[in-house]
Amino acid sequence: MVLQSSSPSCDANRSRDVGGIVLGIESTAHTFSIGWVDGLGVPGKSISAFVRPVKGGIHPREAADHHAERAGGILAQLLNEEVDINEVKAIAFSQGPGLGPCLRIGASVARSLATKLDVPLVGVNHCVAHIEVGRERCGCDDPVLLYASGGNTQVIAR
C-alpha cells in the first residue's frame, strides 16, 4: 500500500509503502473522526463525532474541547470493533487547513499514537485529500478542479 501526503503548499508529494493498516485522524473543524484503510487501500469503518452549535457558527475552542473529550472513546471503539492495534503500520492526520485549536487536538492524538506504536506519522493536507479522493474515484488523470471551500477556494491544475 502506498500512503501519499502533501506539504501544506500542495507542492511536494511524499509516498510511503506501509504494508498494513493506516489509521487516519480528521479534526479540521466540527468533526473528530478516526478511520482506517487496509494494506490494499480499501477503506474500513470510520467513527465520528460532531460539534453541533446551538446558535451561530463553530467556536474553535468549543470544537477543540469536544474533540479532546471524545477522542479516547472513538479510538477505543474503533480498536474494539474494527482494528487490531498490532496491525497498524502508520498514523495519518489532517494537518490543515482548518481551525487551529481543532487541528492541534488531532495532531496530538496522532503523535501520541505514532510514538506509542513506533510507526510513521504522516501529515495530510485537508484540501489535497478531498481532491485526491475525487480524482481517484472518477479515474481522472489530469483534471482541472474547482475546490470551493470558504477561504480555501481554488482552481487547481497540474
Regions found by a protein language model. Give the residues of each.
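Short acidic/glycine-rich loops and adjacent helix/strand connectors
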Residues: 1-158
